[in-house]
A protein has these predicted regions:
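N-terminal alpha-helical "arm" segments
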Residues: 1-32
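Sec/Tat-exported extracytoplasmic proteins
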Residues: 123, 127-130, 190, 208, ...
Protein backbone atom coordinates (compact mmCIF):
# COMPACT_ATOMS: atom_id res chain seq x y z
CA UNK A 1 0.00 0.00 0.00
CA UNK A 2 1.40 3.38 -0.97
CA UNK A 3 1.91 5.88 1.87
CA UNK A 4 -0.56 8.74 2.12
CA UNK A 5 -1.29 11.55 4.55
CA UNK A 6 1.41 12.28 7.11
CA UNK A 7 3.01 15.69 6.58
CA UNK A 8 1.94 17.26 3.27
CA UNK A 9 1.41 20.72 1.88
CA UNK A 10 -2.28 19.92 1.55
CA UNK A 11 -2.63 19.05 5.25
CA UNK A 12 -0.32 21.83 6.48
CA UNK A 13 -0.33 24.60 3.85
CA UNK A 14 1.06 27.09 6.39
CA UNK A 15 4.19 24.97 6.66
CA UNK A 16 5.10 25.34 2.98
CA UNK A 17 3.73 28.82 2.20
CA UNK A 18 4.89 32.13 3.65
CA UNK A 19 2.56 34.31 5.69
CA UNK A 20 2.60 33.11 9.33
CA UNK A 21 4.84 34.42 12.09
CA UNK A 22 5.28 31.31 14.25
CA UNK A 23 4.10 27.83 15.10
CA UNK A 24 3.20 27.25 18.74
CA UNK A 25 4.75 23.84 19.21
CA UNK A 26 3.67 21.77 22.18
CA UNK A 27 6.46 21.27 24.68
CA UNK A 28 6.50 18.59 27.34
CA UNK A 29 8.15 18.45 30.75
CA UNK A 30 6.71 15.03 31.58
CA UNK A 31 10.11 13.55 32.39
CA UNK A 32 10.91 16.45 34.74
CA UNK A 33 8.10 15.53 37.11
CA UNK A 34 9.63 14.62 40.50
CA UNK A 35 10.76 11.00 40.66
CA UNK A 36 9.35 10.19 37.21
CA UNK A 37 9.68 6.48 36.46
CA UNK A 38 11.21 5.53 33.10
CA UNK A 39 10.97 2.11 31.50
CA UNK A 40 14.77 2.13 31.44
CA UNK A 41 15.06 2.40 35.25
CA UNK A 42 17.18 -0.56 36.32
CA UNK A 43 15.78 -0.83 39.84
CA UNK A 44 12.04 -0.95 39.16
CA UNK A 45 12.56 -2.97 35.96
CA UNK A 46 15.14 -5.75 35.72
CA UNK A 47 16.70 -4.90 32.35
CA UNK A 48 17.88 -7.45 29.82
CA UNK A 49 17.95 -8.47 26.17
CA UNK A 50 16.40 -11.29 24.18
CA UNK A 51 18.19 -13.18 21.41
CA UNK A 52 14.89 -13.87 19.66
CA UNK A 53 11.40 -12.43 19.92
CA UNK A 54 10.54 -14.59 22.94
CA UNK A 55 11.87 -14.86 26.49
CA UNK A 56 11.58 -18.22 28.29
CA UNK A 57 12.21 -18.80 31.99
CA UNK A 58 11.52 -21.15 34.92
CA UNK A 59 11.08 -20.54 38.61
CA UNK A 60 13.58 -22.19 40.97
CA UNK A 61 12.55 -24.12 44.09
CA UNK A 62 15.64 -23.25 46.17
CA UNK A 63 17.02 -25.91 48.55
CA UNK A 64 15.20 -25.42 51.85
CA UNK A 65 16.55 -25.04 55.37
CA UNK A 66 19.22 -27.32 56.86
CA UNK A 67 18.12 -30.45 58.77
CA UNK A 68 19.13 -31.26 62.36
CA UNK A 69 21.20 -34.47 62.20
CA UNK A 70 22.49 -36.76 64.95
CA UNK A 71 25.87 -38.47 64.97
CA UNK A 72 26.11 -41.11 62.21
CA UNK A 73 22.43 -40.68 61.38
CA UNK A 74 21.54 -41.46 57.78
CA UNK A 75 21.47 -38.21 55.84
CA UNK A 76 18.31 -36.91 54.16
CA UNK A 77 18.59 -35.88 50.53
CA UNK A 78 16.94 -32.67 49.38
CA UNK A 79 15.13 -32.29 46.08
CA UNK A 80 15.57 -29.05 44.18
CA UNK A 81 14.08 -28.27 40.80
CA UNK A 82 12.92 -25.65 38.36
CA UNK A 83 9.36 -25.43 37.11
CA UNK A 84 6.45 -23.30 35.89
CA UNK A 85 8.16 -22.64 32.56
CA UNK A 86 6.76 -19.50 30.99
CA UNK A 87 7.27 -17.67 27.69
CA UNK A 88 6.64 -14.03 26.87
CA UNK A 89 6.75 -12.64 23.35
CA UNK A 90 8.45 -9.35 22.59
CA UNK A 91 6.21 -6.69 21.02
CA UNK A 92 7.05 -4.44 18.07
CA UNK A 93 6.10 -0.76 18.43
CA UNK A 94 6.22 1.40 15.31
CA UNK A 95 5.52 4.94 14.10
CA UNK A 96 5.55 5.82 10.40
CA UNK A 97 5.08 9.38 9.13
CA UNK A 98 4.99 10.06 5.38
CA UNK A 99 6.38 13.44 4.30
CA UNK A 100 5.59 14.56 0.78
CA UNK A 101 8.53 15.59 -1.38
CA UNK A 102 7.05 19.08 -1.63
CA UNK A 103 6.63 19.45 2.15
CA UNK A 104 10.14 18.09 2.72
CA UNK A 105 11.76 20.61 0.36
CA UNK A 106 9.58 23.65 1.11
CA UNK A 107 9.47 23.48 4.91
CA UNK A 108 9.21 27.13 6.03
CA UNK A 109 8.66 26.63 9.75
CA UNK A 110 10.87 23.74 10.84
CA UNK A 111 8.05 21.21 10.91
CA UNK A 112 10.23 18.50 9.37
CA UNK A 113 12.84 18.74 12.13
CA UNK A 114 10.15 19.01 14.79
CA UNK A 115 8.58 15.73 13.64
CA UNK A 116 11.84 13.98 14.51
CA UNK A 117 11.85 15.47 18.01
CA UNK A 118 8.20 14.56 18.51
CA UNK A 119 8.75 10.98 17.36
CA UNK A 120 11.63 10.61 19.83
CA UNK A 121 9.53 11.99 22.68
CA UNK A 122 6.56 9.77 21.84
CA UNK A 123 8.82 6.72 21.62
CA UNK A 124 9.97 7.35 25.21
CA UNK A 125 6.40 8.06 26.30
CA UNK A 126 5.19 4.79 24.76
CA UNK A 127 7.99 2.82 26.40
CA UNK A 128 7.26 4.32 29.82
CA UNK A 129 3.47 4.07 29.60
CA UNK A 130 3.36 0.52 28.29
CA UNK A 131 6.06 -0.75 30.67
CA UNK A 132 4.20 0.57 33.70
CA UNK A 133 0.68 -0.29 32.59
CA UNK A 134 1.63 -3.86 31.61
CA UNK A 135 3.27 -4.60 34.96
CA UNK A 136 2.54 -2.45 38.00
CA UNK A 137 -0.83 -1.09 36.85
CA UNK A 138 -1.89 -4.61 35.81
CA UNK A 139 -0.73 -6.14 39.09
CA UNK A 140 -4.18 -6.48 40.65
CA UNK A 141 -6.21 -7.70 37.67
CA UNK A 142 -3.66 -9.77 35.76
CA UNK A 143 -5.54 -8.95 32.57
CA UNK A 144 -2.32 -8.57 30.56
CA UNK A 145 0.19 -10.73 32.43
CA UNK A 146 0.03 -13.27 35.22
CA UNK A 147 2.89 -14.78 37.17
CA UNK A 148 3.95 -18.35 36.27
CA UNK A 149 1.53 -19.80 38.85
CA UNK A 150 -1.39 -18.25 36.94
CA UNK A 151 -2.18 -15.48 39.43
CA UNK A 152 -2.12 -11.71 39.10
CA UNK A 153 1.14 -10.22 40.37
CA UNK A 154 -0.60 -9.01 43.56
CA UNK A 155 -2.63 -11.96 44.86
CA UNK A 156 -3.50 -13.77 48.08
CA UNK A 157 -3.41 -17.11 46.23
CA UNK A 158 0.14 -17.52 44.95
CA UNK A 159 1.58 -21.01 45.31
CA UNK A 160 5.29 -21.58 45.93
CA UNK A 161 6.95 -24.44 44.07
CA UNK A 162 7.00 -26.42 47.32
CA UNK A 163 3.29 -25.86 47.91
CA UNK A 164 2.97 -22.98 50.39
CA UNK A 165 0.34 -20.32 49.79
CA UNK A 166 1.85 -16.85 49.43
CA UNK A 167 -0.16 -13.66 49.97
CA UNK A 168 1.35 -10.44 48.57
CA UNK A 169 -1.91 -8.50 48.27
CA UNK A 170 -2.87 -5.88 50.86
CA UNK A 171 -5.78 -3.44 50.97
CA UNK A 172 -4.76 -0.60 53.32
CA UNK A 173 -4.61 2.97 52.05
CA UNK A 174 -1.27 4.78 52.10
CA UNK A 175 -0.79 5.68 55.76
CA UNK A 176 2.16 5.12 58.07
CA UNK A 177 0.43 2.28 59.92
CA UNK A 178 -0.74 0.55 56.76
CA UNK A 179 2.66 0.96 55.17
CA UNK A 180 4.23 -0.77 58.17
CA UNK A 181 1.74 -3.63 57.76
CA UNK A 182 2.87 -3.94 54.15
CA UNK A 183 6.56 -3.77 55.04
CA UNK A 184 6.00 -6.49 57.63
CA UNK A 185 4.20 -8.66 55.07
CA UNK A 186 7.09 -8.23 52.64
CA UNK A 187 9.56 -9.20 55.38
CA UNK A 188 7.49 -12.29 56.21
CA UNK A 189 7.04 -13.39 52.60
CA UNK A 190 7.84 -17.03 51.87
CA UNK A 191 10.54 -18.04 49.42
CA UNK A 192 9.82 -20.74 46.81
CA UNK A 193 11.06 -23.43 49.24
CA UNK A 194 8.65 -22.35 51.98
CA UNK A 195 11.39 -20.79 54.08
CA UNK A 196 11.83 -17.09 54.81
CA UNK A 197 12.21 -14.83 51.83
CA UNK A 198 12.28 -11.85 54.19
CA UNK A 199 12.58 -9.11 51.60
CA UNK A 200 13.73 -5.62 52.59
CA UNK A 201 11.50 -2.72 51.54
CA UNK A 202 13.60 -0.66 49.11
CA UNK A 203 11.22 0.82 46.54
CA UNK A 204 7.79 2.49 46.63
CA UNK A 205 5.85 3.26 43.45
CA UNK A 206 2.67 5.32 43.58
CA UNK A 207 0.29 7.06 41.18
CA UNK A 208 1.26 10.71 40.94
CA UNK A 209 -1.74 11.76 43.05
CA UNK A 210 -0.24 9.86 46.03
CA UNK A 211 3.28 11.25 45.65
CA UNK A 212 2.78 13.99 48.27
CA UNK A 213 1.38 11.46 50.76
CA UNK A 214 4.24 9.07 50.05
CA UNK A 215 6.91 11.72 50.64
CA UNK A 216 5.27 12.99 53.83
CA UNK A 217 4.86 9.45 55.13
CA UNK A 218 8.39 8.36 54.31
CA UNK A 219 10.47 11.49 54.90
CA UNK A 220 8.93 13.20 57.95
CA UNK A 221 11.30 13.13 60.93
CA UNK A 222 8.41 12.33 63.29
CA UNK A 223 5.51 9.97 62.69
CA UNK A 224 3.30 11.77 60.15
CA UNK A 225 -0.32 12.92 60.43
CA UNK A 226 -0.52 12.84 64.23
CA UNK A 227 0.34 14.79 67.39
CA UNK A 228 2.64 12.16 68.88
CA UNK A 229 6.39 12.72 68.91
CA UNK A 230 7.56 9.18 68.19
CA UNK A 231 10.23 8.80 65.54
CA UNK A 232 9.21 7.98 61.99
CA UNK A 233 10.82 4.59 61.35
CA UNK A 234 10.60 5.11 57.59
CA UNK A 235 12.84 8.17 57.88
CA UNK A 236 15.31 6.56 60.30
CA UNK A 237 15.53 2.91 59.26
CA UNK A 238 14.30 3.05 55.66
CA UNK A 239 15.79 6.35 54.57
CA UNK A 240 17.21 5.04 51.29
CA UNK A 241 13.91 3.79 49.87
CA UNK A 242 13.42 4.88 46.27
CA UNK A 243 10.09 6.72 46.03
CA UNK A 244 8.84 7.01 42.46
CA UNK A 245 5.56 8.15 40.93
CA UNK A 246 3.86 7.74 37.58
CA UNK A 247 0.90 9.44 35.95
CA UNK A 248 0.36 6.19 34.04
CA UNK A 249 -0.73 4.45 37.26
CA UNK A 250 -3.47 6.96 38.04
CA UNK A 251 -7.09 7.00 36.91
CA UNK A 252 -6.47 9.55 34.14
CA UNK A 253 -4.41 7.11 32.08
CA UNK A 254 -5.27 3.75 33.65
CA UNK A 255 -8.62 1.97 33.49
CA UNK A 256 -7.70 -0.40 36.30
CA UNK A 257 -10.00 -0.58 39.34
CA UNK A 258 -8.68 1.48 42.29
CA UNK A 259 -6.03 3.06 40.06
CA UNK A 260 -5.91 6.25 42.13
CA UNK A 261 -5.38 4.47 45.47
CA UNK A 262 -3.15 1.49 44.62
CA UNK A 263 0.59 1.45 45.35
CA UNK A 264 3.50 -0.96 45.16
CA UNK A 265 6.39 -2.06 47.41
CA UNK A 266 9.45 -3.83 46.03
CA UNK A 267 12.74 -5.21 47.26
CA UNK A 268 15.86 -5.48 45.15
CA UNK A 269 15.02 -9.16 44.58
CA UNK A 270 11.76 -8.49 42.72
CA UNK A 271 11.45 -9.93 39.23
CA UNK A 272 9.50 -7.33 37.26
CA UNK A 273 11.36 -7.40 33.97
CA UNK A 274 11.94 -5.44 30.78
CA UNK A 275 13.48 -7.45 27.95
CA UNK A 276 14.56 -5.72 24.73
CA UNK A 277 14.85 -7.42 21.34
CA UNK A 278 16.10 -4.18 19.78
CA UNK A 279 16.05 -0.55 20.83
CA UNK A 280 14.70 2.48 19.01
CA UNK A 281 15.79 2.68 15.38
CA UNK A 282 14.81 5.36 12.88
CA UNK A 283 15.08 5.32 9.09
CA UNK A 284 14.24 8.00 6.53
CA UNK A 285 13.17 6.22 3.35
CA UNK A 286 13.69 8.45 0.28
CA UNK A 287 10.89 9.19 -2.22
CA UNK A 288 12.50 7.17 -5.00
CA UNK A 289 11.78 4.08 -2.89
CA UNK A 290 8.08 4.84 -2.35
CA UNK A 291 5.10 4.63 -4.70
CA UNK A 292 3.96 8.26 -4.50
CA UNK A 293 7.14 10.34 -4.27
CA UNK A 294 7.03 10.75 -0.48
CA UNK A 295 9.65 10.38 2.19
CA UNK A 296 8.86 7.90 4.96
CA UNK A 297 10.08 8.49 8.51
CA UNK A 298 9.87 5.04 10.11
CA UNK A 299 10.78 4.50 13.77
CA UNK A 300 10.41 1.30 15.77
CA UNK A 301 11.47 -0.62 18.85
CA UNK A 302 10.83 -4.18 20.02
CA UNK A 303 10.52 -5.06 23.73
CA UNK A 304 8.34 -6.57 26.42
CA UNK A 305 7.74 -6.03 30.13
CA UNK A 306 6.24 -8.58 32.50
CA UNK A 307 6.32 -9.90 36.09
CA UNK A 308 8.67 -12.88 36.12
CA UNK A 309 7.35 -14.07 39.49
CA UNK A 310 5.76 -12.74 42.68
CA UNK A 311 8.83 -12.81 44.91
CA UNK A 312 10.06 -9.55 46.45
CA UNK A 313 6.89 -7.64 45.53
CA UNK A 314 3.78 -6.51 47.41
CA UNK A 315 0.82 -4.53 46.10
CA UNK A 316 -1.89 -2.70 48.03
CA UNK A 317 -5.09 -1.57 46.33
CA UNK A 318 -5.62 1.12 49.00
CA UNK A 319 -9.32 0.40 49.47
CA UNK A 320 -9.48 0.24 53.29
Amino acid sequence: MQPSGGHTGELSPDAVLTGIDAVLWEEYTREQQPQYLRATDDFFFKQGETEGIGFIWDEDSNVGAFEATSEQEELVNTDTWIGNQTTKQSQKWIKQVPISDEAFKADMVGKRAKIGEQVGDRARLTQDKEAIQRTYADAFSGSIHTTPDGQALASNSHVALKGQTVDNLETGSLTADNLWTNVTSLANQYAQDGEAGSHVFEGLLVPFTLYKTAKETMNSQLAPFGAENQINIFDTDYGTVRIYASIFLGSTFSNETNAATSYHLISRSHQICRKVFYGLTTALIPPENTANDSYLLRSKFHETTFPGTWTGYLGSNGTT
